[in-house]
Amino acid sequence: MTAPGVRDGQNAADLDEDRYVEEVLALVNEGNGPARSAGEAPGSREAAAGHHAHPRQDHPGEDRHHEDRPREDRHRATPWAEARTLAGRAARSLAARRPPVSVTLGDALGLVLAAPLTALTDLPSFDSSAMDGWAVSGPGPWAVRDEGVLAGHAEPAPLADGEAVRIATGARVPGGATAVLRSEHGHTDEKGRLHPTREIQHGQDIRPRGQECRRGDQLLPAGAVVTPAVLGLAAAAGYDTLAAVPRPRVEVLVLGDELLTEGRPHDGLIRDALGPMLPPWLRAMGAEIVALRRIGDDAEALHRALTTSPADLIVTTGGTAAGPVDHVHPILRRIGADLLVDGVQVRPGHPMLLARLKPEQHLVGLPGNPLAAVSGLLTLAEPLLRTLAGRAAPEPYTLALRETVHGHPYDTRLVPVVLRGVHAVPLHYNGPAMLRGIAAADALAVVPPGGARAGQEAELLDLPWAAAGIGACSF
């Protein structure tokens, strides 16, 4: 299966887009050796440079550490696909208990209908004109009344046979009218009588009452996502408010004493990249952000935050490993949380976790490295939030990889790619601490253990802005 919207060919109008993508590829792939020429066999440069079949170490510190870990440690981590399934199921019972909310049309965009959308009126609710012209009765020629009929006005007087009246698009059709003659299809003679310039059919250009639906018809089922078009349909059908599944409430806790909130990195301190990135990304997943708090490496502050948060989901950044200031595991044990996923067989992002703090509250612990955190978002947070928001799982799709992607020997890899026609082009700068690749990407390719060769189909995870535009991140 290929990506939605993939084009079979290109024309001159596509050239600007092509040039942009080529510039992106040049920037994101620079510094990683010369690009393979069009006629060069996949992997030939790697072989010439002495790179053999073993996986390339994009982030050697992380991979060496875990490749050397005991086999039983590797097997404690949850396989990637299973982790996504567990995350989606974890919130299923909670989602069923969440009562719907009534929201105005202005606040409903991006929500999911909690009840079917049923027409409150016939659409249209009266016979109306589909065009500017004349409402006519019987065969022509017709005597034209002096007054006209405008949209939004009261019901006009009925027409007698042989009469016509000027009418505007959307106006109520007078009783007795048999058709609407378009302005460009009629003319008046010196006596003021209207003549058609072409044959006119009975009922022509009249929108009959109930043409689109009758009162009580189901227009959309429960579970439909509220798009701009749905808002328009709801308004036309008589709605001021909609019954919707409430947005999951999410609190983001940024951990780490080394993080700066402004300026350039200095003296061993680094900028916090996740604080600006996570809230809009989570909104694109259907969440309402109730708070963003910076906790530092304070265990007691983390404990207070976890035990007082009103959120349905708490997302933490960093602190999920076993270092001297990695407090997430000890605090979860202290509060008696159920650890549902403790490590996932995926790179980057292996030390992510999912815990149930209360029957109605979960925690997703993301690694502190930015791309590893993105991996955790898509692996654990997205399925859980999708379930809470009442959204259906997206239809999986695949594209052929244009280049060989080296794999991890045991774990799935998530690799940033750009979509080029019927191919996914892997991007470099895909180490766990890097954002340069994902910033240029359309999707993440799911690369199985051992890697994938050029031409092999890979499942793709769309990024919110690629699938629905940047506005998807600002609901």
Which residues does each predicted region cover?
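Glycine-rich beta-strand-to-loop/alpha-helix junction loops that act as flexible
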Residues: 169, 255-256, 313-331, 338, ...
